Curated annotation (Swiss-Prot):
Species name: Pseudomonas fluorescens (strain ATCC BAA-477 / NRRL B-23932 / Pf-5)
GO cellular component terms given for this protein: cytoplasm
Protein name: Glutamate-1-semialdehyde 2,1-aminomutase
Subunit structure: Homodimer.
Lineage: Bacteria, Pseudomonadati, Pseudomonadota, Gammaproteobacteria, Pseudomonadales
Entries under NCBIfam families matching the protein: hemL, PRK00062.1
Length: 427
């Protein structure tokens, strides 16, 4: 029995399912989840001392690679001054100033401790600002596990939402309306019917929780136009895309400015951090300035601020994101060539340093239906073959992959060699 198998068996005694986040349990791909004990650069090492090229990157934060020495040094220095104060620090202001200088939509920002807190708070703020109750989200987009957002579409285009998790009251879920991603006509129809009741539209500008689906041409621009027309707050959930698709996030890359934005992952440099922010006239409705309450014991934690500030400064250097995107493009081109040579139906998607892999014969992946039509069983086999070859991909056919600036030529060649063997075995 491997060390991971032993640890997983032990973990299940007192941790539900043996994990603290469901995707880690390998339910989508089968087998025993790997337990890691070390990470450095582009690699993670499991409890059995096997090393893997890592394309999960702690689900996105590790854009510099693991254990970057400058980030570790910043955290060590802060450790000497304490772990948490529960009071304002100069670093919080530095972080707010830096984020507002980088991200087009940000005029004010509030720090929180997770992406879920950020999206939950942004929605409450939008409701408080507009005085409306309903929100619109999109199929396949995940915005954290707050009650408003664990909702799926009803049976018709204009029906109320229904809970997608036990424990979410139907009376609460009815205020969440779910529409197809990349379908601006559906949004236009919905707002024509109930626009006066809608507080906000929340969207991942690149849908990173149905693998990686970029916006169709005109989709984000259409959302901006319709929100302006109906007095609806437009929220970009940039927890994944922020500081990764471009330094200024997807909103900078695609040239569409939302009213509010949410961030997580990279902004903490690997520590638990999130934030939300946007237009001053909206943000001034947050307590203590306004009537919308939001608070957090560990918000702006000094260790997290130290890691996040160092990370954001390092990725701000000229050419950083071009290098990241170039590696990702070369990776995907190499995978596509090897899949084609093996006769395996395969298509990839990319947004800067994030990517999607689909076992599909489609020309492109644009909608939730396109995603669901891909072969998850083939991905499952591919995942385990790549794992055997020393490459760690996201353990789900519906999760995005991430590259880091630590990935280089050696990692690229190792990955492509493993993929060539894997595709050959899938024939």
């Amino acid at each position: 029995m491997s060390r991971s198998e032993t640890l997983f068996a032990n973990a299940q005694k007192h941790i539900p399912g043996g994990v603290n986040s469901p995707v880690r349990a390998f339910k989508s791909v089968g087998g025993t989840p790997l337990f890691f004990k070390h990470a450095e650069g582009a690699y993670v090492t499991d409890e059995d001392d096997k090393r893997y090229v890592d394309y999960v990157g702690s689900w996105g934060p590790m854009i510099l690679g693991h254990s970057h020495p400058d980030v570790l040094d910043a955290v060590r220095k802060q450790l000497e001054h304490g772990l948490s104060y529960g009071a304002p620090t100069a670093m919080e202001t530095e972080m707010a100033d830096l984020v507002c200088s980088i991200v087009p939509s940000m005029e004010m920002v509030r720090m929180v401790s997770s992406g879920t807190e950020a999206t939950m708070s942004a929605i409450r703020l939008a409701r408080g600002f507009t005085g409306r109750d309903s929100i619109i989200k999109f199929e396949g987009c995940y915005h954290g596990h707050s009650d408003s957002l664990l909702v799926k579409a009803g049976s018709g285009a204009l029906t109320q939402g229904v809970p997608s998790s036990a424990g979410v009251p139907a009376a609460f879920a009815k205020h969440t309306l779910t529409l197809p991603f990349n379908d601006i006509a559906a949004v236009e129809k919905m707002l024509a019917e109930v626009g006066q009741e809608v507080a906000c539209i929340i969207v991942e500008p690149v849908a990173g929780n149905m693998n990686c689906v970029p916006p169709a041409p005109g989709f984000l621009e259409g959302l901006r136009r319709l929100c302006d027309q109906h007095g609806v707050v437009l929220i970009f959930d940039e927890v994944m895309t922020g500081f990764r698709v471009a330094l200024g996030g997807a909103q900078a890359h695609y040239g569409v400015t939302p009213d509010l934005s949410t961030f997580g992952k990279i902004i903490g440099g690997g520590m638990p951090v999130g934030c939300f922010g946007g237009k001053r006239k909206i943000m001034e409705h947050i307590a203590p300035l306004g009537p919308v309450y939001q608070a957090g014991t560990l918000s702006g934690n000094p260790l997290a601020m130290a890691a996040g500030l160092t990370t954001l400064r390092l990725i701000s250097r000229p050419g950083f994101h071009a290098e990241l995107s170039d590696y990702t493009s070369r990776l995907l081109e190499g995978l596509q060539q090897r899949a084609d040579a093996a006769g395996i139906p395969f298509v990839t998607t990319q947004a800067g340093g994030m990517f999607g892999l689909y076992f599909s014969g489609a020309d492109d992946i644009v909608t939730f239906d396109d995603v669901m039509a891909s072969d998850a069983n083939l991905f499952k086999r591919f995942f385990h073959l790549m794992l055997e070859g020393g490459v760690y991909l996201a353990p789900s056919a519906f999760e995005a992959g991430f590259t880091s600036i630590a990935h280089g030529e050696a990692e690229l060649q190792l990955t492509l060699d493993a993929a060539e063997r894997a595709f050959a075995a899938l024939k």
